[in-house]
Design a protein with these regions (language model features):
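Buried hydrophobic positions in well-ordered alpha/beta secondary-structure cores of metabolic enzymes
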Residues: 15-18, 67, 120, 148, ...
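Short, small-residue-enriched loops and turns at beta-alpha junctions
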Residues: 47, 77-78, 167-172, 202
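Short coil/turn connectors at secondary-structure junctions
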Residues: 4-8, 34, 64-68, 94-95, ...
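Glycine-rich phosphate-binding loop
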Residues: 62-78, 190-217
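N-terminal beta-loop-helix "entrance" segment that forms/cooperates
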Residues: 35-58, 204
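N-terminal glycine-rich phosphate/adenylate-binding segment common to multiple enzyme folds
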Residues: 48-132
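Glycine-rich phosphate/diphosphate-binding loop of Rossmann-like nucleotide-binding domains
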Residues: 9-31, 132-198
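Generic N-terminal amphipathic, Lys/Arg-enriched alpha-helix
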Residues: 3-14, 39-44
Length: 217
């Protein structure tokens, strides 16, 4: 029986370094005093070895029921080891945006002190993989950008940078970039710019403080 008021959380230990970091994180959560009832969910290469499926029906049922999980990295499923469990998980939960808040902490003397950037990536459709599927690709892009710009406003952000590869895939990435520009007009309170993804990556390594929000795919 679950403890009254406890959070019920699925625990996916993952593959590779996953179990080490996942169990360390789980111990930190427990030490914080948070009331959590953990449910161990079979997934990854251990599950594949037992059942032939890295993310099977039992894992899907647990995630659908609990709706909250601590998940470590899972192997991609390449090399004939079944379907990528990360993609299966995204499809199961309807995930279309990954949100990562990257922030530095003071007192370390780091050249990246003062970094506070919100990074959001479109997860469900890659602009490059959607080549030749213009109508199908545009709707997920609009959904992603509306969410991302709205999240930026809610977080009190002021400037959005869209990272793209239009120089190497003009027709496909150009459509994606146009969807971003259209979304920016629906959020006039945000400053908008676009940059090549390679340049954004270089600036993130050299001077991440210049960024506020980065959107990518």
């Amino acid at each position: 029986m679950a403890e009254l008021g406890a959070h019920r959380v699925a625990f996916i230990a993952g593959d590779g370094v996953g179990p080490e970091v996942a169990w360390a994180a789980r111990r930190c959560v427990d030490a914080s005093g948070a009331r959590v009832e953990w449910t161990d969910v079979p997934a990854g290469q251990e599950a594949f070895g037992r059942t032939g499926d890295a993310f099977g029906a039992a894992a899907a049922a647990a995630l659908s029921r609990l709706r909250l999980a601590l998940k470590a990295p899972l192997e991609s499923g390449t090399g004939g080891r079944g379907r990528n469990p990360n993609i299966v998980l995204r499809e199961l939960l309807g995930v279309y945006a990954a949100v990562r808040h990257c922030r530095s902490y003071g007192g370390r003397g780091s050249p990246w002190e003062g970094m506070d950037v919100l990074v959001m990536m479109q997860e469900n459709v890659s602009p490059l993989s959607a080549a030749g599927e213009e109508p199908a690709a545009e709707t997920p892009a609009r959904r992603f950008f509306d969410f991302a710009f709205g999240r930026a406003v809610a977080a009190g952000r002021r400037r959005v940078t869209v990272a793209h590869r239009a120089a190497s895939a003009a027709s496909v990435e150009g459509r994606w970039l146009r969807a971003a520009e259209e979304a920016s007009r629906r959020f006039p309170g945000l400053s908008f710019e676009d940059q090549l993804a390679g340049h954004v990556a270089m600036q993130m390594a050299r001077a991440p403080q210049r960024f506020d929000v980065i959107l990518a795919a």
